[in-house]
Amino acid sequence: MFMAENRLQLQKGSAEETIERFYNRQGIETIEGFQQMFVTKTLNTEDTDEVKILTIWESEDSFNNWLNSDVFKEAHKNVRLKSDDDGQQSPILSNKVFKYDIGYHYQK
């Protein structure tokens, strides 16, 4: 199994609104190999909010298929970093993607 983490640094006070955007999934569940998604808010941050999107996949290839899919492009077409100079406000200050091999998983 494989896990991808997209770690978002957000303007303070924007985490809840960002999380709510995930209530209406936009196709990730249709990608072969997708298994689970967790969207988390880091507690007790000071200057910014932090939201992590954790997705579980059968394999890294499944995740890469998602990244290269038209479904991914469509789902992310309106996502902008705050630094993008297009006149639209975005709470996203930065993001970084981390990849993990899952060595052990237990679920009750």
Curated annotation (Swiss-Prot):
Disulfide bonds: none annotated. PROSITE patterns: ABM. It is found in: Cytoplasm. The keyword Metal-binding applies. Its main location: cytoplasm. The keyword Iron applies. It comes from the Bacteria. Allows bacterial pathogens to use the host heme as an iron source. Catalyzes the oxidative degradation of the heme macrocyclic porphyrin ring to the oxo-bilirubin chromophore staphylobilin (a mixture of the linear tetrapyrroles 5-oxo-delta-bilirubin and 15-oxo-beta-bilirubin) in the presence of a suitable electron donor such as ascorbate or NADPH--cytochrome P450 reductase, with subsequent release of free iron. Belongs to the antibiotic biosynthesis monooxygenase family. Heme-degrading monooxygenase IsdG subfamily. This is Heme oxygenase (staphylobilin-producing) 2.
